[in-house]
């Protein structure tokens, strides 16, 4: 029996930017894609739809931003709302995945590789964070 290739797309949702990454479940490979602007937590749905149609993922993962103690915060509710909107728009399974420490890890990874080019406003931290979320999800769901 031939397994269907599972393409998974992950989002690091923010009120100003949304990082996107793509991955493949069988090989476990991941790749950060791009960062889309978000105005007051409202995503650019046309761009998300375009990326969705290009990659045709089988599943979506949205980072779940919890406080360090595991409690929810305002951005947690906005991320959950974003996940529900993705489900309704694309008629696809969306899972939430704990994203604590991903931004810190993304900054560390970026700085290690590109320390001479590090500029806080121009770094792809959000898409790297989305890739970390996806890698974590793949590791827990292999």
UniProtKB/Swiss-Prot annotation:
Record localization: Cytoplasm
UniProt xrefs under Pfam families: RuvX
Enzyme Commission numbers on file: 3.1.-.-
BP GO terms, sorted: rRNA 5'-end processing
CDD domains: YqgF
UniProt keyword Hydrolase, yes or no: yes
GO annotation, cellular component aspect: cytosol
The keyword Cytoplasm belongs to this UniProt entry's keyword annotation: yes
Alphabetized InterPro entries for the sequence: RNaseH-like_sf, YqgF, YqgF/RNaseH-like_dom, YqgF/RNaseH-like_dom_sf
Gene3D superfamilies: YqgF/RNase H-like domain (3.30.420.140)
Disulfide bonds: none
GO molecular function: nuclease activity
SMART domains in the cross-refs: YqgFc (SM00732)
Assigned keywords, A-Z: Cytoplasm, Hydrolase, Nuclease, Ribosome biogenesis
Family: Belongs to the YqgF nuclease family.
Function according to Swiss-Prot or TrEMBL: Could be a nuclease involved in processing of the 5'-end of pre-16S rRNA.
NCBIfam families with a match to the protein in the record: RNAse_H_YqgF
Name the record gives this protein: Putative pre-16S rRNA nuclease
Taxonomic classification: Bacteria, Pseudomonadati, Pseudomonadota, Gammaproteobacteria, Enterobacterales
Primary gene name: yqgF
């Amino acid at each position: 029996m031939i397994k269907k290739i599972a393409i998974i797309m992950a989002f690091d949702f923010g009120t100003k930017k949304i990082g996107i990454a793509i991955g493949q479940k069988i090989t476990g490979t991941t790749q950060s894609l791009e960062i889309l602007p978000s105005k007051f937590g409202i995503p650019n749905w046309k761009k998300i739809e375009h990326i969705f149609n290009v990659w045709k993922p089988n599943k979506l993962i949205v980072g779940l931003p919890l406080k360090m103690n595991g409690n929810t915060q305002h951005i947690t509710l906005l991320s959950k709302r974003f996940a529900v909107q993705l489900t309704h728009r694309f008629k696809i399974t969306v899972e939430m995945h704990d994203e604590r420490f991903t931004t810190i890890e993304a900054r560390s990874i970026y700085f290690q590789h590109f320390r001479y080019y590090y500029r806080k406003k121009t770094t792809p931290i959000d898409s790297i964070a989305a890739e970390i979320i996806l890698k974590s999800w793949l590791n827990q769901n292999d």
